[in-house]
């Protein structure tokens, strides 16, 4: 091979490598911000059916079962909803009404790569405690339109669409947001700009996306691949409603120090519960204690159903 030909092929290899490297952020962003192909809900259901969790983070947690596909499986009456956001995204949701009128409403928001039916186990006891419950599929999740996730900011429109519907139905006077991970971030982002949320229960929330360590669990993009993610640690001081922070010491996706940072940033009244569960597992690892602490928090916050 002549020197000229060698230089030619070296140039070709260099250009190919340059193109590949330049495409990595785009490809990674597409994979991680849009991991929601039409097949994903079916894959996620199969994982639950065979007891495979996408976040195997330990903590001695029992499985998140019984496996309920629909609210009817949980023995609760519900309405199937389709909501439309201000930017035209169609969302699917379930509404579980309280047994008595005039009750506060729980808005349950799931984590990344999950859907409303993974939050379904909370609905029966919340209804029995006297609350309405709305379970929402974020954009790109469950039965909602397959739009990219934004780790908080774009999901604000999803949360607001849910609250708009609650107000139109006359059950949005008192709204309690209970979110896990991505769902908690969306609630915080919403509460900063929308005063229709009366209390926040934040489970496994990151204080700052760029400080999370996902290397030991499910691989998600680093901060430089997901720019513009607001820091809940910076947003909480702007919120003047009761906040309950929940986290597990076995969470390897968002380490427990994030919970302490969030608690320090939040205004009073605030509460924190640290246990030994994994990412988003507190309600399943300690269901009775979780219920007790949530209801006590709401009692102290003046958000209990009327007798």
PLM ranges: what are they?
Residues 118, 149-170:
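Alpha/beta-hydrolase active-site loop
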Residues 50, 184-241, 274, 284:
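Hydrolase active-site cap/lid region
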Residues 18-83:
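An N-terminal hydrophobic leader/cap segment in hydrolases
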Residues 126-145:
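Conserved alpha/beta-hydrolase
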């Amino acid at each position: 091979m002549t020197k000229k030909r060698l230089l030619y092929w070296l140039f070709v290899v260099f250009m190919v490598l340059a193109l590949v490297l330049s495409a990595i952020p785009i490809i990674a962003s597409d994979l991680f911000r849009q991991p929601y192909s039409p097949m994903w809900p079916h894959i996620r259901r199969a994982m639950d059916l065979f007891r495979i969790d996408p976040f195997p983070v330990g903590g001695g947690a029992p499985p998140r079962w019984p496996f309920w596909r629909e609210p009817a499986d949980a023995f609760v009456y519900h309405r199937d909803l389709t909501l439309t956001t201000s930017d035209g995204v169609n969302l699917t949701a379930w509404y579980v009404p309280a047994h008595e009128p005039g009750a506060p409403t729980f808005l349950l928001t799931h984590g990344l790569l999950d859907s409303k039916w993974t939050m379904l186990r909370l609905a029966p006891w919340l209804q029995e405690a006297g609350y309405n419950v709305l379970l929402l599929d974020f954009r790109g999740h469950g039965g909602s339109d397959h739009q990219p996730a934004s780790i908080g900011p774009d999901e604000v429109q999803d949360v607001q669409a849910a609250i708009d519907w609650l107000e139109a139905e006359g059950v949005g006077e008192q709204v309690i947001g209970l979110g896990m991970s991505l769902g908690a971030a969306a609630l915080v982002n919403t509460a900063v700009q929308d005063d229709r949320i009366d209390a926040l229960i934040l489970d496994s929330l990151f204080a700052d996306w760029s400080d999370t360590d996902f290397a030991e669990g499910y691989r998600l993009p680093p901060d430089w691949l997901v720019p513009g993610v607001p820091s809940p640690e910076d947003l909480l001081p702007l919120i003047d409603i009761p906040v309950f922070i929940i986290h597990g010491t076995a969470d390897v996706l968002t380490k427990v120090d994030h919970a302490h940072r969030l608690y320090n940033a939040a205004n009073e009244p605030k509460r924190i519960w640290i246990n030994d569960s994994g990412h988003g597992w507190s309600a399943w690892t300690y269901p009775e204690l979780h219920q007790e602490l949530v209801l006590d928090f709401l009692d102290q916050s003046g958000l209990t159903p009327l007798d």
